[in-house]
């Protein structure tokens, strides 16, 4: 229908169009100066020292795990309540994903669940900053230090998220996403920030065929026309078109996230009169980026299942999302790990629903959602 309200819509405008035109007019449209500007801007945003732009957060996860030397016989701990790309990258490198449970109300991976899963084969811990809120980084980094295990933060939902006064990605290594539904987007893209210069160098090489420099380095730096392959790598570089759009979006981040926060506050107020349960907020000091606004639809409490609620909203012209179906319940992982049970993850996976939340939502859009929820709840 023409008036369908989507679950998400990117906030694009004249600034993004002008950014693309600038790249077109420059004559250099692949990875180049706009990538360098984006990397510098993300270092300023996060407070970290190095940033490497990539074609997607999935690509960033792949080469980050490769740079750590993850491979056959290794284990990597991650929550099952995450997008499956993380699990896929672990498996494709020959390692074993060790999926752990989350807190029932915040859906954050907990230090207790992580520590219980550590073995001599554990080579990395990947906490997820879920829905725009931060995981408990102090406790997780303390675990990593105690056991000598690297931490890679999945910050795909966390552009604009802060933990105890510092932006996510301020220390260690974190991977952000610029996918179309994220808080800032360039359609597809991502960036890895890190405080380790050797690690950053490995990422730069792995993202571009294993070469020591990319085409822009050779063009602008007067390097030798044929670069040297240091080790086999991939084609995960980000075109300057995308980088320019991401830069334009980054300049709007505070305003975009402020609007998200205002809509989330309205949702919380409205939920007081409805049977649907929003996620709880983490107790530690933080700034929430409100990438998602998630409710739990428990049939015993709400008189309707999550799937039925989503179908009913669709008939009313309202889109929703599911973030996420637990990874260990997906066909491949269910067959590979048939005895794995994660009670709180599974309880939420069957009940969570993401409501429409994007900066260009109008008050009329919001009222439509709340009116529909009241109608479905029989109020």
UniProtKB/Swiss-Prot annotation:
EC number: 2.6.1.87
InterPro entries per record: ArnB_NH2Trfase, DegT/StrS_aminotransferase, PyrdxlP-dep_Trfase, PyrdxlP-dep_Trfase_major, PyrdxlP-dep_Trfase_small
Name the UniProt record assigns to this protein: UDP-4-amino-4-deoxy-L-arabinose--oxoglutarate aminotransferase
Residues where N6-(pyridoxal phosphate)lysine is found: 182
Protein's UniProt keywords contain Transmembrane: no
Pathway: Nucleotide-sugar biosynthesis; UDP-4-deoxy-4-formamido-beta-L-arabinose biosynthesis; UDP-4-deoxy-4-formamido-beta-L-arabinose from UDP-alpha-D-glucuronate: step 2/3; Bacterial outer membrane biogenesis; lipopolysaccharide biosynthesis
GO cellular component terms, A-Z: membrane
CDD domains: AHBA_syn
Function statement: Catalyzes the conversion of UDP-4-keto-arabinose (UDP-Ara4O) to UDP-4-amino-4-deoxy-L-arabinose (UDP-L-Ara4N). The modified arabinose is attached to lipid A and is required for resistance to polymyxin and cationic antimicrobial peptides.
Cofactor section: pyridoxal 5'-phosphate
Lineage: Bacteria, Pseudomonadati, Pseudomonadota, Gammaproteobacteria, Enterobacterales
Keyword list, A-Z: Aminotransferase, Antibiotic resistance, Lipid A biosynthesis, Lipid biosynthesis, Lipid metabolism, Lipopolysaccharide biosynthesis, Pyridoxal phosphate, Transferase
Signal peptide range: none
Quaternary data: Homodimer.
Pfam families according to UniProt: DegT_DnrJ_EryC1
Family indicated by similarity: Belongs to the DegT/DnrJ/EryC1 family. ArnB subfamily.
Enzyme class: transferase
GO molecular function, one term: UDP-4-amino-4-deoxy-L-arabinose aminotransferase
Gene Ontology biological process terms in this record: lipid A biosynthetic process; lipopolysaccharide biosynthetic process; response to antibiotic
Catalyzed reaction equations: UDP-4-amino-4-deoxy-beta-L-arabinose + 2-oxoglutarate = UDP-beta-L-threo-pentopyranos-4-ulose + L-glutamate
SUPFAM superfamilies in the record: PLP-dependent transferases
